[in-house]
């Protein structure tokens, strides 16, 4: 064999080995560099350090893990580990591995209609959340993930340009969702996935966390595939008190679960974040008139302010969202004796009023106050301790309408002439569904000259003296069960019997200041469907009416504080005559 050929073959083999090692080293260096870039992207999200290789290995081996609370999509909140999001497909991804957990495991029921609601507005088809499923092995063929090391709360804002929606649908539910799960502390990062821009009230969302909230559009700048190491998806609806009329005309929710106490805990938190202190405020009592500057105007606002000041002998000031900072408005409202405003989103600020203050809501012509009650419902929540008054303009001549404006500002020029005539002549907007009823919009955006004597008369029916806040909490505490309930029967002949029942007061009564204590007793003959109810003032009573000899009776007893605070029934007594 030619020695030169052997030498060349060896040289080629050595060069190939060196070249292969160089390529492998370069690939490894490229992968390390890519991991460093992805790690830096992850750390741009947070100061939390992350071991990128370990995080990627965990995702490949363990996949996604999900455990949810709630039985239905309308009350479900889910906790995820390693939930991912494709910014290109704009969809969440659940990666399956042998270690994945999915509870509840709904199968195709997950699409009927969704796993959960992303917002606190119940069962709205623009607010549904779901994910796409992939095997964890698919990660090898996908863009390298950027890991989000912060604990994430993922939700939708419903309408961030409207202050009522901001507080009712977003801020309160986010605040109490974070109270519900200990992982959701002030270092949680909020991710809003509905697609809106920041909006005029975005600074309020920033108060809920020490970290800047991120919007869906911003996620595209972070990477093509984001993976949340730990996240919670969905919002608690427990603080919401109003439904907006998507299925039936708007009104209070059927089962309201929030009280004024929880609202006031939230407002206390917000005031602290806004650096608003009641101690900084003047002790002088005053009335606040909320001024609107674009639509739904009070045409004789100056006259109204003067009349209120004279009637109640109190300083009267105006505030507006356009001319005052939010913290200044909160500072003024939080110490006011009365808040007067046209119907509108700004009235949600009444949740900052002190206990004992008065809310006066003004309604334009043809708008029935009983049909639009978000602020009445708020003011009358148990424990809010606010007085609510509604006034409606009933004089057609005191209203200014704008039929030629665009439809979304109350214009009706796009409607046929007959419909325009009907709306103009109508004296009351019929109950309707949300959100584009032209008659409602026409009346909602009209301006009003307030009949001041009429308004003062309506206020005076509720506010008999000078209005003023009360600082002390007058909580509604419920009685416990009555104790040691006993019964004793006596029979007189074959046709008459008596049933003597006695009990001890609930043990918590001795710690409470209660104006009035009553007891409710139900007596039911065994086997019958009806019962005889009694309201009693004492802890014992002998019953003879409708009591029969040689009969078994079931007796229930409960305590009532102040006429309407009903305690639980004690265990049923079985009494034989």
Curated annotation (Swiss-Prot):
Catalytic activity from the UniProt record: 3-O-(alpha-D-mannosyl)-L-threonyl-[protein] + UDP-N-acetyl-alpha-D-glucosamine = 3-O-(N-acetyl-beta-D-glucosaminyl-(1->4)-alpha-D-mannosyl)-L-threonyl-[protein] + UDP + H(+)
An example Gene Ontology CC term for this record: endoplasmic reticulum membrane
Lumenal side of membrane: 26-577
Record has Glycoprotein as a keyword: yes
One example of a Gene Ontology biological process annotation: protein O-linked mannosylation
Associated pathway: Protein modification; protein glycosylation
Coiled-coil ranges from the UniProt annotation: none
Highest taxon in the source lineage: Eukaryota
EC number: 2.4.1.312
All copies of domain Fibronectin type-III, residue ranges: 481-577
Membrane-crossing segments per the record: 5-25
EC class of the enzyme, as a word: transferase
Residue positions with a glycan: 98, 275, 335, 540
Its membrane topology: Single-pass type II membrane protein
GO molecular function, one term: protein O-acetylglucosaminyltransferase activity
UniProt keywords, alphabetically: Endoplasmic reticulum, Glycoprotein, Glycosyltransferase, Membrane, Signal-anchor, Transferase, Transmembrane, Transmembrane helix
InterPro entries recorded: FN3_dom (IPR003961), FN3_sf (IPR036116), Glyco_transf_61_cat (IPR049625), Glycosyltransferase_61 (IPR007657), Ig-like_fold (IPR013783)
Subcellular locations according to the entry: Endoplasmic reticulum membrane
Cytoplasmic topological domain residue ranges: 1-4
Purpose: O-linked mannose beta-1,4-N-acetylglucosaminyltransferase that transfers UDP-N-acetyl-D-glucosamine to the 4-position of the mannose to generate N-acetyl-D-glucosamine-beta-1,4-O-D-mannosylprotein. Involved in the biosynthesis of the phosphorylated O-mannosyl trisaccharide (N-acetylgalactosamine-beta-3-N-acetylglucosamine-beta-4-(phosphate-6-)mannose), a carbohydrate structure present in alpha-dystroglycan (DAG1), which is required for binding laminin G-like domain-containing extracellular proteins with high affinity.
Xref: PANTHER family: GLYCOSYLTRANSFERASE, PROTEIN O-LINKED-MANNOSE BETA-1,4-N-ACETYLGLUCOSAMINYLTRANSFERASE 2
Family, as annotated: Belongs to the glycosyltransferase 61 family.
Name of the protein this chain belongs to: Protein O-linked-mannose beta-1,4-N-acetylglucosaminyltransferase 2
The organism of origin for this protein: Gallus gallus
């Amino acid at each position: 064999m030619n020695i030169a050929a052997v030498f060349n073959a060896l040289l080629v083999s050595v060069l190939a080995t060196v070249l292969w090692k160089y390529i492998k080293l370069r690939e490894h260096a490229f992968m390390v560099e890519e991991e460093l870039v992805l790690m830096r992207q992850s750390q741009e999200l947070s100061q939390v350090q992350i071991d990128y290789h370990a995080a990627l290995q965990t995702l490949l081996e363990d996949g996604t893990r999900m455990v949810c609370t709630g039985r239905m999509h309308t009350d479900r909140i889910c906790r995820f580990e390693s939930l991912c999001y494709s910014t290109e497909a704009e969809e969440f991804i659940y990666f399956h591995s042998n270690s994945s957990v999915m509870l509840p495991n709904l199968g195709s029921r997950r699409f009927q209609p969704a796993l959960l609601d992303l917002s606190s507005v119940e069962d709205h088809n623009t607010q549904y959340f779901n994910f796409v499923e992939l095997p964890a092995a698919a990660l090898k063929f996908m863009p390298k993930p950027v890991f989000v090391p912060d604990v994430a709360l993922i939700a939708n804002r419903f309408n961030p340009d409207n202050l009522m929606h901001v507080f009712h649908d977003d801020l309160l539910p986010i605040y109490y969702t974070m109270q519900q799960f200990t992982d959701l502390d002030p270092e949680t990062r909020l991710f809003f996935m509905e697609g809106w821009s920041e909006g005029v009230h975005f600074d309020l969302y920033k108060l809920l966390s020490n970290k800047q909230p991120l919007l869906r559009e911003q996620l595209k700048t972070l990477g093509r595939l984001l993976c949340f190491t730990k996240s919670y998806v969905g919002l608690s609806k427990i603080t919401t008190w109003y439904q907006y009329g998507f299925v039936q005309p708007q009104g209070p929710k059927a089962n309201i679960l929030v009280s004024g106490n929880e609202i006031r805990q939230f407002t206390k938190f917000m005031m602290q974040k806004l650096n608003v202190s009641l101690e900084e405020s003047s002790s002088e009592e005053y009335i606040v008139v909320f001024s609107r500057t674009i639509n739904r105007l009070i045409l004789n606002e100056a006259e109204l302010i003067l009349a209120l000041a004279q009637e109640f002998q109190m300083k009267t000031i105006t505030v507006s969202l356009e001319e005052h900072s939010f913290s200044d408005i909160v500072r003024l409202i939080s110490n006011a004796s009365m808040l007067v405003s046209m119907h509108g989103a700004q009235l949600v600020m009444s949740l900052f009023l002190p206990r004992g203050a008065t809310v006066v809501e003004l309604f334009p012509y043809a708008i029935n106050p009983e049909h639009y009650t978000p602020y009445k419902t708020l003011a009358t929540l148990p424990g809010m301790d606010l007085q609510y008054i509604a006034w409606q303009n009933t004089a057609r001549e005191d209203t200014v309408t704008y039929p030629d404006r665009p439809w979304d500002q109350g214009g009706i020029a796009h409607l046929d002439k007959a419909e325009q005539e009907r709306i103009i002549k109508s004296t009351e907007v019929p109950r309707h569904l949300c959100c584009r009823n032209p008659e409602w919009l026409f009346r909602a955006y009209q301006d009003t000259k307030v009949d001041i004597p009429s308004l003062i008369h309506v206020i005076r029916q509720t506010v008999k003296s000078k209005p003023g806040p009360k600082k002390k909490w007058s909580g509604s505490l419920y009685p416990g069960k009555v104790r040691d309930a006993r019964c004793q029967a006596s029979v007189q002949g074959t046709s008459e019997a008596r049933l003597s029942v006695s009990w001890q007061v609930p043990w918590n009564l001795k710690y409470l200041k209660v104006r009035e204590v009553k007891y409710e007793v139900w007596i039911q003959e065994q086997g019958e469907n009806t019962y005889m109810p009694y309201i009693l003032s004492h802890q014992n009573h002998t019953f003879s009416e409708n009591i029969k000899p040689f009969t078994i009776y079931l007796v229930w007893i409960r305590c009532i504080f102040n006429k309407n605070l009903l305690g639980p029934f004690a265990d049923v007594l079985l009494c034989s005559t």
